[in-house]
Every structure is written in C-alpha cells, then in structure tokens.
C-alpha cells in the first residue's frame, strides 16, 4: 500500500486508533442503516473506514487532510463503490457528499487541535445551528472536551460549551479510550461520545437562542465573577434581581452554577422586558444591542 511505512505526524495530530474493541464500539454507536450516508473525518490509514464499509450504510465519504495518505486509502478501498474520498481541510471543504447529498451521520477520530471549530461546523451554535441537523455524530475526542460537553452545573468543567451542547443535542458517553489504544499513544485520555442533535422543532425559538448565546459570551468570558457584575450592563440592579428571581438564580452566583434551562429562562425574561419596553415606549436600559455582535476571537476562549 502507498502508505505503508507512513509515520503519524504530530502537526496533523495523528494517532492511529488500533484497539479493535473501541473500533467496534464506535460503529455500533453509529447504528448504521441501509439509508445512512456517512461522513468520516480523518480516516488515517482506514481502520475505522473498513468497519464502516462492513456496515449496511449506503455510502461512506472520508475527508483526509494528509495528502500522503490519500493514494493508500483509495487503493485499499478501490473495490467498494460506496467509498469516496476528498483531500483537504474539513473546516473549509463543503460537507455534502460527492453527489451533493448531505450525510445523515458523522463518525470521526478528531484531531484534538480542531475539536472546537469542528463542533461548530457539525453541530453549530444556538444562534446558528447546522441545518439540517445530522441524525447522529459519534466522535473520538479528548476526555477533557467530553467532560465539558456533559458537565453539570457547579462542576469545574461546566462551561459555555456545556450549556450550548446540552441545549442543541443529547450527548452521551460511549466508552473511555486510554492512550494504549493508539499508535503512537497520546499524552491525554480520550473518550468516544455520541451526539444526537435535536430536530428543528425541538430547538429553542430563534430569538431566545440568540439571547442565550449572547448571555453565554458575556458571562463566561469572566467566569470567576459574580453574575451581578457580568450582567450589570443588561439592566438596573433592581430589575436584574427580579429577572434572576424569576429565572431561578441569585446574582451572587457565578455562570458555571446555572443550569442550561436557567439561561433559557433568563433569556425569555430579558426578551419579554424588551418587548414591554418597545410597547410602552420606555427605555429600560437592558443593553441588549451589545450582545448581538459576532463572538470573533472570543469563540475559543469559552
């Protein structure tokens, strides 16, 4: 094969998954059906690809950044017409399959240095979710990221990512993956997670979603500060206290202590206040305009 002797490259974050049990668990979690069209990110030398093609899936399209692996992958799977391959950066390429049809499921051993941006592309954010949503994503990620996704309020790992993902999808753990399961072994623990994005009719209304996203950016950029301080620009303190009481939290709390639904309740309260202000012609000083700006460079900080 063309990639025999190819060594994993640090600059691509390559760690070949070699554990047969973990490979089987990933494919089992994907629950592939004859109607499924699979997008595989980072096939490497094809260990997971082989199992995906052993499933009843209708098509498997792999996206590989490393040019030196492309010929070997095409040679290895040349006999299966369901397989296709594109070389390039998954963060930049269009994600439709070669025939222009969207994939129904995503399976990936993600290079850990692109996990955040890739989740943005595959799941989206509250104010711009991926449309249409994938039915399921099964991803091998760094354990620290998995912990942040599933963290509960008050846990040290709880973050804006926790709130966002728990409002956009059902996220569950498939299995832990220790370093010995890879070649070469990474220096961190890993985990396979299953993400089932919510259908459009189960998501937040767009105005509430935009408001929650704005609140998360504002609050978690200063996660050690009390909400009395980080939310001060939204309303005078008496009004802010009333909003907090209605949403079910106190202003001396910090953002990582609030459950996802509390953020939703706060967003609804703020939006209702803005609607009331618009109706009676008064300015309640909620400062809503500043929250609609693009997160820009703040994206990776939260």
From Swiss-Prot:
Keyword annotations from UniProtKB, A to Z = Cytoplasm, Methyltransferase, RNA-binding, rRNA processing, S-adenosyl-L-methionine, Transferase
Report the EC code(s) recorded for this entry. Answer: 2.1.1.182
Residues that hold S-adenosyl-L-methionine according to the record: 15, 17, 42, 64, 89, 109
Q: Superkingdom, according to UniProt? A: Bacteria
Q: Where are the annotated segments for Disordered?
A: 275-302
**Keyword Methyltransferase applies:** yes
Task: Report a single Gene Ontology molecular function.
Answer: 16S rRNA (adenine(1518)-N(6)/adenine(1519)-N(6))-dimethyltransferase activity
Q: What's one GO-annotated cellular component?
A: cytosol
- Tell me any Pfam family this protein matches: RrnaAD
Which residues belong to the signal peptide in this entry?
none
> Sorted alphabetically, which Gene3D superfamilies does this protein's record hold?
Ribosomal RNA adenine dimethylase-like, domain 2 (1.10.8.100), Vaccinia Virus protein VP39 (3.40.50.150)
Per UniProt, subcellular location reads as: Cytoplasm
Q: Which InterPro entries match?
A: KsgA/Erm, rRNA_Ade_diMease-like_C, rRNA_Ade_Mease_Trfase_CS, rRNA_Ade_methylase_Trfase_N, rRNA_adenine_dimethylase, SAM-dependent_MTases_sf
Indicate yes or no for the key word Transferase.
yes
Please write the reaction equations for the catalytic activity of this protein: adenosine(1518)/adenosine(1519) in 16S rRNA + 4 S-adenosyl-L-methionine = N(6)-dimethyladenosine(1518)/N(6)-dimethyladenosine(1519) in 16S rRNA + 4 S-adenosyl-L-homocysteine + 4 H(+)
Under PROSITE patterns, the record lists: RRNA_A_DIMETH (PS01131), SAM_RNA_A_N6_MT (PS51689)
**Family under the similarity heading:** Belongs to the class I-like SAM-binding methyltransferase superfamily. rRNA adenine N(6)-methyltransferase family. RsmA subfamily.
Do you know which HAMAP family this protein is assigned to?
16SrRNA_methyltr_A (MF_00607)
What is the protein's known function? Specifically dimethylates two adjacent adenosines (A1518 and A1519) in the loop of a conserved hairpin near the 3'-end of 16S rRNA in the 30S particle. May play a critical role in biogenesis of 30S subunits.
Q: What is this protein called?
A: Ribosomal RNA small subunit methyltransferase A
The protein's gene is named rsmA
